[in-house]
Amino acid sequence: TGIHLSGTPVGVGISLGKAIILHPGTPEEPPRESSNPPEEELQDFHSALEHTINDTIKLVEKISGDVGPEEAAIFHVHLMFLEDQHFQEKIQNYILEGNSVSWSIYETIEEYLSAFSEIDDPYLSEKGADLKDVGYRLLHFLGHELLAETQKEGILVIEELLPGDM
């Protein structure tokens, strides 16, 4: 007598065990105002950007080696977002207006997601999930914890598992 859960498996095969339910850490909107000068906020952004790009490159190498280059292709899309000049400039402009780096990233991601949601195209909907993952990972490098880590053994149950959570 138990609960039957169904979803999209990440692993192969059938699993029986205790469900470990993680609630995704969709971030709340960070504070808009910053107590730091824009120059410091820009420095924090560039540092988070560099860390996220390097981390993404490592993920591409790991996934390519472990699973295959086709499965790693999603992270190339992440790199495209991270290296996109317009994306970076939008965040930097918010920072230069006196906003916090966290809010600037959050707001930029929200604006992009809103634009993607208005387009009736399944491919672009998937890109929205990729962009959300990129934003969450940038925020993570700024110190925001977005997904609870667990050392428990069992079957991970989560509403949405983004590629960068792997």
Predicted regions and their residues:
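Non-catalytic, soluble scaffold/interaction modules
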Residues: T1-M166
